[in-house]
């Protein structure tokens, strides 16, 4: 299977682009309305109750918490007593949203894996697509934890699973950006340097690069995993990141690591690759308009779903540095990070649409697989 830029028909790309744009707009509108409703319904409690998920990058270190045995531990950087974050993660709307994204992501990525296994991995692009799909499934694994946390209204799965929850999210985040970048570099080489790049655009190189990405992503995710733990606050156990005063430098390091390695470097490479691709296509005798549409679709969707998370994490770093402060600012930052996190998780089911279902070749194989399955003679492997 070769997911080249030329395998997509103009009509298919137009319809796919419109459908994906519509889906993305609907998802973001739903998220914003759900979170906005929760924000309006929140009342300031007399005692602080933390209702954050993995997205809470500020609350845990802007408040002084006290444990049940009255051994208090100070984790404040800015003294804002009883400043609630204004994000209710236990609402029915948010639970429904998590469930929907989970099933869509699971279903879409399993279909991609099934097709890849049936028709084998033949090219470096197939290898990157396989690993991108596995990365999205890692993202999908975060949702059962978030659902449990929202329904149970506290964490009772222990420290180990708490850390793995954080690890799943950030390995999935770094992997997704890395494999999107590698796929873009491969498209760049195929279009701009088609002959010179043939010796390195092989399945073997794809395997090596994929292993490197998984190792590097795990290393990049390790620091924040160390700070994720379970703590009891006012009788309720929470699983999220806790920083004490001495760990402020680590918080800033992790925030800038997310921005530099998770967005700035990949986005710079993406923009360069697609700029060169578009220039090459425009000056070539066979002006491949289908490929240009595919290029814009990839860039727009990548930025739409992943850039907001990095931007809001950067804003939370500014809060840490006291560029701005106060309860209202804290609530805004937490809400922004929370929405951006959910938007980033949505790409786990959008990616199969972009990199697979927009490909005429993939669609043919999927239909062939469905026909074979209906006949009862399908063999996966």
Swiss-Prot record:
The chain crosses the membrane at residues 92-112, 127-147, 166-186, 207-227, 252-272, 295-315, 337-357. GO terms for biological process: calcium-mediated signaling; cell chemotaxis; immune response; positive regulation of cytosolic calcium ion concentration. It is found in: Host cell membrane. It holds the Pfam family 7tm_1. Glycans are attached at residues 2, 15, 19, 41, 50, 56, 62. InterPro entries: CCR1-9-like, Chemokine_rcpt, GPCR_Rhodpsn, GPCR_Rhodpsn_7TM. GO terms for molecular function: C-C chemokine binding; C-C chemokine receptor activity. It is a multi-pass membrane protein. GO terms for cellular component: host cell plasma membrane; membrane. It comes from the Viruses. Keywords: G-protein coupled receptor, Glycoprotein, Host cell membrane, Host membrane, Membrane, Receptor, Transducer, Transmembrane, Transmembrane helix. Residues 1-91, 148-165, 228-251, 316-336 are extracellular. Putative chemokine receptor. Belongs to the G-protein coupled receptor 1 family. This is G-protein coupled receptor homolog Q2/3L. It comes from Sheeppox virus (strain KS-1) (SPPV).
């Amino acid at each position: 299977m070769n997911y080249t830029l030329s395998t997509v028909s103009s009509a298919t790309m137009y319809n796919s682009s419109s459908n994906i744009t519509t889906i993305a707009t609907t998802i973001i509108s739903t998220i914003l309305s759900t979170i906005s409703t929760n924000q309006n319904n929140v009342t300031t409690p007399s005692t602080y109750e933390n209702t954050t998920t993995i997205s809470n990058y500020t609350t845990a270190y802007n408040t002084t918490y006290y444990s049940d045995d009255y051994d208090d531990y100070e984790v404040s950087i800015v003294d804002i007593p009883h400043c609630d974050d204004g994000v209710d993660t236990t609402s029915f709307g948010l639970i429904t949203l998590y469930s929907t994204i989970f099933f869509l992501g699971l279903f879409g990525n399993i279909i991609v894996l099934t097709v890849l296994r049936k028709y084998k991995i033949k090219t470096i692009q197939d290898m990157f697509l396989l690993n991108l799909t596995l990365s999205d499934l890692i993202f999908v694994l975060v949702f059962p934890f978030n659902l449990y946390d929202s329904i149970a209204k506290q964490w009772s799965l222990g420290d180990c699973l708490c850390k793995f929850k954080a690890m799943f999210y950030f390995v999935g985040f770094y992997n997704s950006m890395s494999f999107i970048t590698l796929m873009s570099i491969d498209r760049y080489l195929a279009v701009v340097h088609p002959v010179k790049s043939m010796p390195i655009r092989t399945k073997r190189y794809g395997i090596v690069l994929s292993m490197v990405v998984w190792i590097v992503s795990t290393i990049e995710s390790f620091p924040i995993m160390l700070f994720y733990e379970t703590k009891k606050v006012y009788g309720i156990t929470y699983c999220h990141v806790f920083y004490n005063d001495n760990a402020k430098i680590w918080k800033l390091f992790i925030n800038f690591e997310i921005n530099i390695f998770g967005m700035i470097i990949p986005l710079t490479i993406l923009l360069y690759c697609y700029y060169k691709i578009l220039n090459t296509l425009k000056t070539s005798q066979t002006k491949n308009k289908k490929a240009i549409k595919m290029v814009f679709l990839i860039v727009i969707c990548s930025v739409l779903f992943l850039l907001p998370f990095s931007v809001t994490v950067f804003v939370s770093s500014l809060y840490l540095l006291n560029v701005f402060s106060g309860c209202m600012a804290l609530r805004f930052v937490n809400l922004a990070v929370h929405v951006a996190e959910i938007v980033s998780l949505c790409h786990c089911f959008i990616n199969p649409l972009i990199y697979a279902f927009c490909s005429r070749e993939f669609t043919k194989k999927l239909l062939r697989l469905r026909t074979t399955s209906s006949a009862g003679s399908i063999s996966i492997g």
